[in-house]
Regions:
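Short alpha-helical elements
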Residues: 1-205
Length: 205
């Protein structure tokens, strides 16, 4: 009974409708995602379940499927299948690029800031390794934000034993490619970065 109560409270506290309204998901996200014609799942319900997982950080198997999916018999495996498919075919990326392009007038591109962020890793996962300086296993990402701190893009994750300059030109190319899809250019824009990015290779990039 206690477990059921805790789960119920957790679901209520992380109500997906409090994060993003259905009409916004339908208008801004769903046009870039698709399912097979034979699928009996509702696209909106599936996306909301995926967003719940991203918001709470829970394991896929811990998603309260019945809370989001009306089709009986649906499992977390099915939700993961669609989420993973949209990741691999670039659907999520297209949706995000479209959002950046549509609302770029709200961005402050007078200056952009580049920085790396290490996230502590507790379980086995891809792109994670022991970081001797921080003394824990971590994964590292490079983030580019506008002058307001709004995230514009991030690189693919690398294992935590690498510093911010590891394959910097490759990762910065990823960021530039994403921004180009959104119709944003860093040409003639001042970019601020800390001393960890100071290298001849990056200066002459």
């Amino acid at each position: 009974m206690l477990c059921k109560f805790v789960m119920k409270e957790k679901i209520q506290n992380h109500n997906i409708t409090k994060m993003i309204e259905d009409k916004i998901l339908i208008k801004e996200i769903l046009p870039y995602l698709s399912m097979s014609k034979d699928s009996e799942l509702d696209l909106l319900e599936t996306v909301k379940a995926c967003f719940y997982r991203l918001k709470t950080g829970c394991q896929w198997r811990e998603i309260p499927v019945k809370q989001f999916i009306s089709r009986a018999g649906t499992t977390w495996n099915t939700l993961y299948y669609h989420f993973n498919k949209w990741c691999k075919n670039g659907s999520w990326l297209k949706a995000y690029a479209a959002l950046l392009k549509k609302y770029q007038r709200y961005l402050d591109m007078s200056c952009v800031n580049l920085d790396g962020s290490h996230s502590k890793v507790f379980t086995a996962c891809q792109s994670a390794a022991y970081n001797g300086r921080k003394r824990y296993r971590s994964t590292n990402l490079l983030f580019l934000v506008d002058n307001q701190g709004v995230i514009l893009c991030c690189s693919m994750p690398v294992s935590g034993e690498h510093h911010d300059l590891y394959e910097i030109t490759t990762h910065f190319d990823e960021i530039l490619e994403m921004l180009e899809q959104a119709g944003l250019s860093l040409k003639y824009i001042f970019m601020n970065a800390d001393a960890g990015f100071d290298s001849t290779e990056f200066r002459t990039y």
